[in-house]
Amino acid sequence: AANQHLCGSHLVEALYLVCGERGFFYSPKAGIVEQCCHNTCSLYQLENYCN
C-alpha cells in the first residue's frame, strides 16, 4: 500500500482496520498526527500504534 495522508477520523478508522481487536492508543502527542497527517505514513507505521 502506498503511503497516505490520514487526518482526524480517517486516521482513527485506519487504526481500527490495522489494529483490529488489539486496539490502539490514539495520542496526538505520540507523533502519529505529525507522521500521518502532516506527512504521510504507511500501514506498517500505523501498526506501531497498536496495543
From Swiss-Prot:
GO terms for cellular component: extracellular space. Keywords: Carbohydrate metabolism, Disulfide bond, Glucose metabolism, Hormone, Secreted. CDD domains: IlGF_insulin_like. GO terms for molecular function: hormone activity. Pfam families: Insulin. Heterodimer of a B chain and an A chain linked by two disulfide bonds. Insulin decreases blood glucose concentration. It increases cell permeability to monosaccharides, amino acids and fatty acids. It accelerates glycolysis, the pentose phosphate cycle, and glycogen synthesis in liver. This is Insulin. It comes from Meleagris gallopavo.
